[in-house]
UniProtKB/Swiss-Prot annotation:
Catalysis performed (reactions): L-homocysteine + L-serine = L,L-cystathionine + H2O
Native source species: Rattus norvegicus (Rat)
Gene designation per UniProt: Cbs
Cross-link (Glycyl lysine isopeptide (Lys-Gly) (interchain with G-Cter in SUMO)): K208
Subcellular location: Cytoplasm; Nucleus
Stated name of the protein: Cystathionine beta-synthase
Length: 561
């Protein structure tokens, strides 16, 4: 892939895999303790790539690979990365009324179960080739999980220490696989901005600065990311389709997959239309109007970001579509039940968009969809009916016999006014309050009453014992944002589903609030004054536990006798 050589700050030439590059000016921040500098490189730095359509390969400064056939006996499992199958989609295509041929590139057949195996191996081998990564070194990577699994897999085979930093949102299946591969795992708050020191990116850079001979391969900036798809994935697609591809549909996370494949297809199939998929709540799509939504969170993992990664070349995408959780999980389940493809949620995102975008294609034309990962990582999520019901993605079957209380509303419970805590209260004081009142958890709210998160006695005590916080630290440092909200109008059946998985649920109601009265999204941050613009805020009504539900049912049972 023709690309300009990026210049490091010390003047040496190299690509992002030259990992000892110094942060650019403006990227040093004072720490909370005073003059301590925060050393990091932002994952959205401007790209220096000079790839242009039509520019000869000889101009490329990069090392390029050529797809090879696998031997009958593989020397190690890393040779099982790549050469994934192309499968015709039959029933979904027919039901959608498509005239064109719909094909799926099944990336979950890679050794580690996802498309990210390709870039993980490529980043490591390019760093080894450059002499940056040496035996005994440590690999650190901020990731949503799949890149981490790919890196941990390669590190296990090659003998590197591997530390993976990922948000709390990501599934426990990913955590379990990473641990089994020998990786060390650090979890970070899901809602932390990418440029926050508490984000998965920020924590990874802090670890890199503390651990000798450690490297962040940096999938967000590393040219090896799109190169893996330019050299291999795209060539496989062209070979499997005999050079005939009329449309490609791919979701975007770091953007390396869609960038690398699109650049090669634009060179070899000039008429091929590239369709990008970006979830609602992410900002990767263009034009910018597509990203305007009140939604900031989504359940689908591995795609979408709140920044534009360096490796994403949006110029090669002809059109963007926004995906949503409902369609994504519905189509992921359809791919499993109707096509037998055991894929993950982001595969559903891509397929949901593909059946819309491919409506414009005619008979004899061909649409290829990238299915990024497998269902293995989501057994407790969208594959679970309970999880789908709890999240509101499925409706209860009315024909199923339920207890007498199942369809009663949450408002039937006699909930007392909740104990709430301000984010500036210390951990020590909060623990004392919870113990005095006999509570295990409490909502943390700002001065106007909007919910910032939850704090639990167990989480605070474990954080104190692990040395992550001090007793004098503000409680906002141990904030838990993965709470399950429920409304007064929701059923006790829905509450029951939540309490099967969690110790408590937060009963909330929405309130329209002027922004000059509310704090910003940063926990413990200053007042966000924005010309009185109004927005919806979640306000706490009460906290309900399994004991509350059992007491209600038991009391009503007595009166029913």
């Amino acid at each position: 892939m023709p690309s300009g050589t990026s210049q490091c700050e010390d003047g040496s030439a190299g690509c992002p895999q030259d990992l000892e590059v110094q942060p650019e000016k403006g990227q040093l921040e004072k720490g909370a303790s005073g003059d301590k500098e925060r050393v990091w490189i932002s994952p959205d730095t401007p790209s220096r790539c000079t790839w242009q359509l039509g520019r000869p390969m000889a101009d490329s400064p990069h090392y390029h690979t050529v797809p090879t056939k696998s031997p009958k006996i593989l020397p190690d499992i890393l040779r099982k990365i790549g050469n994934t199958p192309m499968v015709r989609i039959n029933r979904i295509s027919k039901n959608a009324g498509l005239k064109c041929e719909l094909l799926a590139k099944c990336e979950f057949f890679n050794a580690g179960g996802s498309v990210k195996d390709r870039i993980s191996l490529r980043m490591i081998e390019d760093a080894e080739r450059a002499g940056t990564l040496k035996p005994g070194d440590t690999i650190i990577e901020p990731t949503s999980g799949n890149t981490g699994i790919g890196l941990a897999l390669a590190a296990a085979v090659k003998g590197y220490r591997c530390i993976i930093v990922m948000p709390e949102k990501m599934s426990m299946e990913k955590v379990d696989v990473l641990r089994a591969l020998g990786a060390e795992i650090v979890r970070t708050p899901t809602n932390a901005r990418f440029d926050s020191p508490e984000s998965h990116v920020g924590v990874a850079w802090r670890l890199k600065n503390e651990i000798p001979n450690s490297h962040i391969l940096d999938q967000y900036r590393n040219a090896s990311n799109p190169l893996a798809h330019y050299d291999d994935t795209a060539e496989e697609i062209l070979q499997q389709c005999d050079g005939k591809v009329d449309m490609l549909v791919a979701s975007a996370g770091t953007g390396g997959t869609i960038t690398g494949i699109a650049r090669k297809l634009k060179e070899k199939c000039p008429g091929c239309k590239i369709i990008g998929v970006d979830p609602e709540g992410s900002i990767l799509a263009e034009p910018e109007e597509l990203n305007q939504t009140e939604q900031t969170a989504y359940e689908v993992e591995g795609i979408g970001y709140d920044f534009i990664p360096t490796v994403l070349d949006r110029a090669v995408v002809d059109r963007w579509f926004k995906s949503n959780d409902d369609d994504s999980f519905a189509f992921a389940r359809m791919l499993i039940s109707q096509e037998g493809l055991l894929c993950g949620g982001s595969s559903g995102s891509a397929m949901a968009v593909a059946v819309k975008a491919a409506q414009e294609l005619k008979e004899g034309q061909r649409c290829v969809v990238i299915l990024p990962d497998s269902v293995r990582n989501y057994m407790s999520k969208f594959l679970s009916d309970k999880w789908m019901l709890q999240k509101g993605f499925m409706k209860e079957e009315l024909s199923v016999k339920r207890p007498w209380w199942w369809h009663l509303r949450v408002q039937e419970l006699s909930l007392s006014a909740p104990l709430t805590v301000l984010p500036t209260v210390t951990c020590e004081h909060t623990i004392a309050i919870l113990r005095e009142k006999g509570f295990d958890q409490a909502p943390v709210v700002n001065e106007s009453g909007a919910i910032l998160g939850m704090v639990t006695l167990g989480n605070m005590l474990s954080s104190l014992l692990a040395g992550k916080v001090r007793p004098s630290d503000e409680v906002c440092k141990v904030l838990y944002k993965q709470f399950k909200p429920i409304h007064l109008t929701d059923t006790l059946g829905m509450l029951s589903h939540i309490l099967e998985m969690d110790h408590f649920a937060l009963v909330v109601h929405e309130q329209i609030q002027s922004r000059d009265q509310a704090w910003s999204g940063v926990v413990g941050g200053p007042t966000d004054r924005n010309n009185g613009v109004s927005s919806k805020q979640l306000m706490v009504f009460g906290v309900v536990t399994a004991i509350d539900l059992l007491n209600f049912v038991a009391a009503r049972e007595q009166t029913r006798k």
